[in-house]
């Protein structure tokens, strides 16, 4: 597991440059400061790769700063950003440790390759132990259209593959809040009591990082399910409720390792193998796409 530096706090001016500082009050009066101290504290937990996030995330973070400064508001937001911790479930555990060391009441996991929408703050209208928005996980091509086939919300279903049924978003067109058995972690708000519950019995690293998120495996080393499925299964078993606000619909950038792309294209080429084109086809494909340790990252 790779450890790297973390940045404890990002301000509006750091996100959008010095121009953002103009819309943040330079002085906060005593009444406003007092009201902020009474607000519910949300820690935004953001695991990054190569210190990169999407532009909509940067915009959301700036909006959080401004939202927390509004007179009469209910929420105040802080940020914990860690960079290049791997694997992702370990990054989440490090963020859980920072959360437990803070006075925050809610942790909001945001994956760095997601694209928040204007409805993001509606998550805090829902009183649930765990509440999430949706974003496309899987896709399929249909004619000239690319459709999301999996929106990261699931119910148990023994008759379906792996025992889970992906719920169709088109069934919820009125912004319904629904109960589910599992959600993806990339846009997930968790109450403090949930993290504290699992931290009590979690194994810990030498720095105190609790193993709350992990990929359970069988003796052969094969994974049983992903870390978010496992976390949700344990949360439901412990009596916590999980909800989805279906009007919070984010985008999702799926990044591909170019070596995987090369293997896919190689297979496609071999399927249509033509002896006469071997020299000009496969060689050019290999030279173009076989990039050692070259991974596509968010820009």
Residue positions per predicted region:
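Alpha-helical elements of Rossmann-like donor-binding domains used by nucleotide-donor carbohydrate transfer enzymes
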Residues: 60-63, 94, 122-123, 230
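Short, Asp-centered acidic motifs that coordinate Mg2+ and/or phosphate
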Residues: 106, 130, 242
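Active-site nucleotide-sugar/metal-binding loop of Leloir-type enzymes
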Residues: 93-106
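A short, glycine-/small-residue-rich helix N-cap motif at loop->alpha-helix starts
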Residues: 86-91
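N-proximal low-complexity "stem/linker" segments adjacent to membrane-targeting elements
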Residues: 2-85
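C-terminal catalytic/acceptor-binding lobe
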Residues: 2-30, 37-38, 197-299
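Conserved catalytic core of nucleotide-sugar-dependent glycosyltransferases
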Residues: 96, 117-216
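Short beta-strand-to-loop acidic/aromatic patch adjacent to the donor-nucleotide binding site
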Residues: 104-115
């Amino acid at each position: 597991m790779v450890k790297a530096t973390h940045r404890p706090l990002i301000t509006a001016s750091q996100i959008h440059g010095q121009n953002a500082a103009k819309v943040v009050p330079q002085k906060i009066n005593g009444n406003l400061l007092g009201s902020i101290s009474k607000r519910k504290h949300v820690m935004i937990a953001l695991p990054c790769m190569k210190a990169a996030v999407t532009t909509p995330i940067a915009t959301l973070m700036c909006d959080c700063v401004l939202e927390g400064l509004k007179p009469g508001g209910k929420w105040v937001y802080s940020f914990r950003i860690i960079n290049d911790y791997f694997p992702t479930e370990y990054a989440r555990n490090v963020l859980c440790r920072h959360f437990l060391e803070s006075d925050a009441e809610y942790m909001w996991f945001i994956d760095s390759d997601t694209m928040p929408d204007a409805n993001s703050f509606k998550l805090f209208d829902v009183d649930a132990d765990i509440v999430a928005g949706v974003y496309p996980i899987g896709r399929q091509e249909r004619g000239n259209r690319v459709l999301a086939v999996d929106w990261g919300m699931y119910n148990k279903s023994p008759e379906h593959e792996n025992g889970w049924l992906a719920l169709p978003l088109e069934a919820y067109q009125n912004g319904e809040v629904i109960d589910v058995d599992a959600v993806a972690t990339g846009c997930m708000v968790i109450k403090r009591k949930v993290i504290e519950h699992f931290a009590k019995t979690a194994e810990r690293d030498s720095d105190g990082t609790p193993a709350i998120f992990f990929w359970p495996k069988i003796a052969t080393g094969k994974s049983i399910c992903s870390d978010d499925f496992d976390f949700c299964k344990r949360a439901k078993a412990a009596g916590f409720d999980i909800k989805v606000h279906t009007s919070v619909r984010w985008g999702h950038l799926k990044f591909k390792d170019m070596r995987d792309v090369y293997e896919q294209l190689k297979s496609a080429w071999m399927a249509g193998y033509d002896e006469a084109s071997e020299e000009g086809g496969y060689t050019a494909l290999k030279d173009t796409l076989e990039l050692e340790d070259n991974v596509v990252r968010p820009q």
